[in-house]
Amino acid sequence: MLAGRFVRARASFDATFRKGWGQLLMPFAFFFLVDLFVLSKVSGPPFVAFGHLPYGLWFLVSLFFWRLMVVPVGRWRSFDRLVWPLALLGLVLSGLLPNWWSLVRTFAFFPAFLFGMLVLPRLEPHLRRPWVRVASAVLLVATVVVVWRRAQQYNYLWLHQSRSYDELGRDFVSGAGLRLLVAAAGIVVALAVVSLVPTRRVGSLSGLGRFTLYAYLLHLPVTEFIIYWLIPRTDSNAAVSVSVSLAIIPFVLVVMTRPVRRLTQPLVEPVEFAKSVPVP
């Protein structure tokens, strides 16, 4: 949803493609190779298939296509009338595809991206109202309490939006209903979080998103190492989970520091790095 919030409307297709190529697809190619190398060392030959991407990299490819998919928004009235029905139809039909097709999430999460682009800017003034912020805080606390107390009763695979209805043991009607419900609940919780962001910080979220891209991409090979090498060699998975949870905050802060960003910029932001290199 936040990824859609900072998309500029009415951008040309060519400009969107060039920007996405440099910001998303080039880092994807670099980290695709990095992830395959890590997987080959910690879990044997990695599984590679068309449509199936290493852990977490689906988001870069999906964001690239989301930006292209919304280029006609605001240009063609007929498209504006159809974009929401098509987005929701894609969300529902994506549940018919199997899990190995990880790019299915391009369709599953597109409504949230579209919501962030078209609806969130109009809601932001209302989200800043004091009573809305109080209600948002109550909602988030209640959500944490409910999830904590009923954690064993929930199937969290629904949150991934990548499993088919058959894999989740549902028919099309009930599966589609649950998929829509999960998407709606996720947007409501995300709105609650946005409403609690101080107003003076809203303008800096786009820049913050640029820095968090470092944390997102750099955590992927580390996560693969933990999942495929560390956990199978540890007697207590709970101990690993607690340790990782405690270490994740300092890890994120470290990888977002300027020295780490400078060191890894050629991988994460190759275009910006190329611009910074002095021309002889």
Regions found by a protein language model. Give the residues of each.
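Alpha-helical transmembrane segments and their immediate juxtamembrane cytosolic regions
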Residues: 1-280
